Amino acid sequence: PVETYATNVMGTINIMEAIRATNNVKVGVMITTDKCYENKEQIWGYRENEPMGGYDPYSSSKGAAEIAIASWRCSFFNSADYGKKHHVSLASVRAGNVIGGGDWALDRIIPDCIKALEAGKDIDIRNPQAIRPWQHVLEPLSGYMLLASKMWKEPTKYCEGWNFGPRAESIVPVWDVATDVIKNYGSGQLNDISTPNTLHEAKLLMLDISKAKFLLGWEPRMNIHQCIALTVDWYKRYKDEDVYALCLEQIETYLAYGK
């Protein structure tokens, strides 16, 4: 937990202090996570003005990072002082559970699935009914870049927190995601290894993206099945193809969904 706080809280503060120390940064988009919210297991999505919190060290450290961002924004990058005391536009962004090719992190559902499938092993699922807002990594990235471009053009208008989550129908249980991975991969078997003694993990977490939709004109392009299909396609091809070209191809595929 100490390293988690050092990374997520002090790491965030160090970046903001670096921004303060230079005149070359004009826009800062600070990325946290949907887990920054105080999770009450509610059946509707969290809005940007709801309380920060967190049961576990990871979630609470992300909530603390958001509080630090808000503090630095008020104290050092206040919109009212723009052009007088500073020239920085600072916002924070929160996405859902991102998936996509190239993710090999530990204890994440897609990498765990792919590692098991490539090894010819069954996929163990420890929390099958946990519901998450799943989205391909290109979805929030498109939102972050759109926000940054608007902040560049209007530096005092968008200095707030923003949610960039998926469509409502993409908020599904872990088991459904793993099942779809197997379908797209063409083989595999799931094992439910959930036990009552596992570490605490929220069962329900959703984001409300109304603010980004109406104020930025941003909304997700893909549904959950398209997200998983694009992700699995990357993992099936990366060993035999040029990864850079594959990524560019997938960006083009993603952009085509919005036409």
Positions of predicted regions on the chain:
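Short, well-ordered alpha-helices that flank and scaffold nucleotide-derived cofactor binding pockets
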Residues: E17-A21, A70, C74, K115, ...
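Catalytic helix-loop patch of NAD(P)-dependent Rossmann-fold dehydrogenases
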Residues: V2-E17, A21-V27, C36-N97, W104-A105
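Amphipathic alpha-helical segments in well-structured domains
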Residues: N8, T12, L106-P111, Y144, ...
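C-terminal substrate-binding subdomain of Rossmann-fold SDR/epimerase-dehydratase oxidoreductases
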Residues: N97, L117-K259
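Residue(s) in the substrate-gating loop at a strand-loop-helix junction
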Residues: T33
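Short, solvent-exposed loop/helix junctions and linker helices
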Residues: A6-V9, Y58, K62, D103, ...
